[in-house]
């Protein structure tokens, strides 16, 4: 046989399956000790996989074991042959499965009986193949494992008079053959929590791989900007530290790192300033509400998957870079970065380590003026220094079990003497935010994020695949001081707040094959987390602030703003994935979520002398999803889904605005439950990949934020269109782009009369486009553009927060890379034509001191090399 029968809905046959990294995570201790599982691995026969391959004969009686008396490995032009010597080869039955770059063939009703022991192993037997192992998997099964150097080997099966021949072809060798080779299947994990071909998922998904991340980092290492330029459905990017206003389909996304939640109960909107881009392997974005990972994904899920170990024995790579504003080559604008990546694999142990340090200079707009360090009153990273330490350690306990520990520490501090001049707020007309030197502030804005993540997987535990995870996260973010003298709800104070959060939790999931040779699988499990959160503030002397023109912040004391609260959350879920035929895939599931919140007695910033009674809150939600994919032909498929997402209302925000006489029990917040309906079409041809989707979602209770810190709980509805296309007209040219159009309304008075949602929720039209060319071998050039349209739904004279008119803008970047010496030189020109424009988030600000322009033309150069 040349090919393996598959349940893939867009192709009847598939000869190659490429397993990508990013395994789903597990809650280890909820099922007892990991060492118990290690010492008692499952011995049952594996369930057939969708890539199962059988020989000609029906299975013999289990007690009539076929004896294999010899093993030979013979190199071939395409790879190698593993020959199992037996006089009854025609009775042998073979099934295959994939694990990373290893292809595993199990031969049932057979026993290895060699003259010199019952284990055969050979390293580097052929080009592109690192190891061949043949062992007795259990009492009636022989297991043959062939590991490819860079990718999964291909497999063919033959009989001979003297034995069974298993022919393996290294993929990298096969690609040089004139024979036609299928493209590897792209696997994603975020949409279903299991490794699933992207064409089997009835959702809109964007995957940004390591190569794309590195290219976009040539102009900006800020994840907010990288995602905003590449993901349809996401709002146009801002150039600050906050993802406030960076909505996905008009609602907040849930941000995960390897499945570890990065959000906090008191939403700090810093979820994407928690890890450096250098530590990321790829980013998977599921667009649209989802409850599969629990609370927070009303807009979708952004799952950041960290660097994986390489297959080489040792990989070491260093990168150095510098950037500066090109307007006048201002000395203060120079930024530098350094990173080093190392990965090693020895036997069944591997590790990955990444170190990244960056020092940013000042940012300058297209007119040569310095941009305030806090451009939109939500945080910035100009004049900031950051360091990121990442480590991942893994051990393959056996062919079925793996234990992996991941650690990441991100620390960023904004050491600046630049503030935003408050005097521009008194000048008539719209004024650009103005930088003011001389800032005096002891505690600098910044972010600190530490997480530890333990993962365990067992691929054959009683015919099921178990995945478990334990995680711990410690987080602190400190904001720039805020002038709240005109807001009674803020105590008419000038203050600086910080959010402190400590969270731990775990996940356990089991994937069990049900019927039809594993074409139907049930994923079921449990998630648990506990978080302690608070938001204290430092209060400053108002007289000193006024006398200094808004530059001096002399601390007079500490107060509580959001009281300490504890959130405990438990989620139970089940998800069915059924490949009904080669054309039709069905998904459906349910999740039950229960959460408890405990709050002690507290005092607010507005009423520091009044004690408000604490208490306990409980809320729960049951969420459903159902979807299907139908392949019209091997290249084109349509999909539809209904999914619910939910979000616990920002309890901390409600508590900090609590009036006298209020009690926690009287708050009784209900989760926001979002119903989402989506249809779409996907095409995957040799030189063109395209998708188009339409969606509509609604919720009875919204979470619309209004200044100076309140939330409107009212019915909302949001709808839109998204499209993406990539094409390769030739081997040296690539072109593509995305389209995003979103609308949304809110019934503020709950009277059936809907009005437009504000601009922080609903972005204007967004278009992106790129053209890339390999001009010479090893030299690539790319032009990319982003267009943000206008939006004037509240009238041209509206100056309220989030309701100001938004003007359109166009920005173009240039990215180039060339092989130079022992490494690669990359050059990036952000805002190539030096356009003076204001990001959407800036245009929506009520105060001109937060109306900051975007960066002007900025040059970045970096050089990376292996050693």
From Swiss-Prot:
Which residue range or ranges hold the TBDR plug domain? 197-307
Q: Name one GO biological process term.
A: cellular response to iron ion starvation
Q: What happens when the gene is disrupted?
A: Viable. Significantly decreased growth rate in liquid BG11 medium, but grows similarly to wild-type in iron- or copper-deficient BG11 medium. In iron- and copper-deficient BG medium, shows a much more pronounced retardation of growth compared to wild-type. Significantly decreased growth on media supplemented with ferric chloride, but grows similarly to wild-type on media supplemented with non-toxic concentrations of iron ammonium citrate (FeACi). Shows reduced chlorophyll fluorescence in BG11 medium similarly to wild-type in iron- and copper-deficient BG11 medium.
Instruction: Please state the protein's primary subcellular location.
Output: membrane
Pfam families reported for this sequence = AMIN, Plug, TonB_dep_Rec_b-barrel
The record's Gene3D superfamilies line, in alphabetical order, gives: 2.60.40.3500, TonB-dependent receptor, beta-barrel domain, TonB-dependent receptor, plug domain
Q: Show where the record puts the motif TonB C-terminal box.
A: 850-867
What induces or represses this gene?
Expression is transiently highly up-regulated by iron starvation.
Motif TonB box per UniProt: ranges: 185-192
Topology of the protein relative to the lipid bilayer: Multi-pass membrane protein
Alphabetically sorted, this entry's keywords are:
Cell outer membrane, Ion transport, Iron, Iron transport, Membrane, TonB box, Transmembrane, Transmembrane beta strand, Transport
> What practical uses are noted?
Useful as a bioreporter in an application to sense bioavailability of iron in natural freshwaters, especially in eutrophic lakes with high iron. The application includes the V.fischeri luxAB genes fused to the promoter of this gene, and determination of dose-response relationships between luciferase activity and free ferric ion (Fe3+) concentrations to assess iron availability in water quality samples.
Write down the SUPFAM superfamilies for this protein, in alphabetical order. Porins
Q: Which residues form the TBDR beta-barrel domain?
A: 313-867
**Function statement:** Involved in the TonB-dependent uptake of iron in complex with schizokinen, a dihydroxamate-type siderophore.
| Similarity remark | Belongs to the TonB-dependent receptor family.
> What is the designated name of this protein?
Schizokinen transporter SchT
- Origin species, per record, is Nostoc sp. (strain PCC 7120 / SAG 25.82 / UTEX 2576)
Which gene holds the coding sequence for this protein?
Answer: schT
